[in-house]
């Protein structure tokens, strides 16, 4: 049974992970894994990159997110995608699905993990750099943010940035990872995007 706690309603901003939380990128991920060994910027790599981005462009938000998007818009909540993926990918998905009502063009709300001031930032191994960068860019305090992700590393990185974290189980493919999240006593678990609304009311 998933764990749920009452979240303080004085939040100001929501951080969403991209791959496996907001968007179903499973087909793009499979393609990327098959081409991991390619040397960067070779003709083969460029062709593989082009096909990967085509898969990304075809990716859609998981079922249930439309209700969450409406809740965010209706309640004037600030939302941001904070991901280790590139900003190019995040922008492409937002544009392809026309999500500018949720992530407006004229605001900083897509924080990519690569090439931020020349440094690659990830949430791996609980590194909070990406979250700290997002807090600074959006000018919000960590206690005013809730982060939603589909991996233990997302929660650990949020913890180290002082942000409340929630596990999202719908995009978790590995059973071991899913069980780790279910057994985690320190973070809420939810099994559908619609439960985000229940947590925030």
Task: Please describe what each predicted stretch is.
Residues 22, 66-67, 131, 151-154, ...:
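Short glycine/proline-centered loop/turn elements that form peptide/ligand docking sites
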Residues 87-146, 152, 156, 160, ...:
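Substrate-recognition "cap/lid" segment bordering the active-site pocket of phosphatases
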């Amino acid at each position: 049974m998933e764990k749920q706690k009452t979240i303080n309603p004085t939040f100001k901003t929501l951080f969403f992970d991209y791959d496996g939380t907001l968007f179903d990128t499973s087909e793009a991920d499979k393609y990327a894994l098959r081409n991991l060994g390619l040397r960067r910027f070779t003709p083969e790599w460029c062709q593989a990159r082009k096909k990967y981005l085509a898969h990304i462009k075809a990716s859609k938000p998981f079922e249930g997110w439309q209700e969450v998007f409406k809740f965010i818009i209706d309640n004037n909540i600030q939302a941001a995608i904070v991901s280790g993926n590139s900003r190019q990918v995040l922008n492409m998905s937002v544009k392809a699905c026309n999500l500018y009502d949720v992530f407006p063009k004229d605001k900083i709300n897509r924080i990519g993990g690569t090439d931020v001031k020349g440094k690659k930032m990830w949430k791996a191994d609980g590194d909070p750099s990406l979250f700290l960068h997002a807090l600074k860019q959006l000018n919000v305090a960590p206690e005013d943010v809730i982060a939603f992700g589909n991996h233990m590393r997302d929660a650990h990185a949020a913890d180290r940035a002082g942000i409340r974290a929630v596990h999202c189980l719908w995009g978790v493919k590995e059973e071991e990872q899913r069980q780790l999240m279910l057994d985690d006593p320190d973070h809420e678990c939810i099994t559908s995007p619609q439960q985000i609304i229940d947590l925030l009311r």
